[in-house]
Amino acid sequence: MQKKYLGRPNYLKQLLAYQDSDLVKIVTGIRRCGKSTLMLLMVEELRKQGISEKNIIHMNMESLQYHELMDYMSFYQHIKEGIQSPGKHYLFFDEIQTVTGWEKAIESLRLDHDVDIYITGSNAYFLSSQLS
């Protein structure tokens, strides 16, 4: 059964305005406020634009399937291996703060590859970190 999501047209419009820019798009908010849903809506929009599934990577870092990627080097290597097809790749990472040193990996991906990066995280982490 396919999941249906409540549309978030205003937030989606804001993300779309920065699509394909060099900026890393960061979506913050309290837990369960719809950050991950917004990412899925953006992925859906990319599919509508004709972006190949091979060029879209979406990972929820709270999932145990990624437990071996909790340091920035293993995370970076995993993503690097996944962006082998030609063209721009769209990277979506939910709860990125669970990866130790994630900032280094994200910056390196941004500098070294043709990518458009979207990340989510909790307000508490981002407001108390060096990013603020």
Over which residues does each language-model region extend?
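Phosphate-binding site recognition
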Residues: 1-132
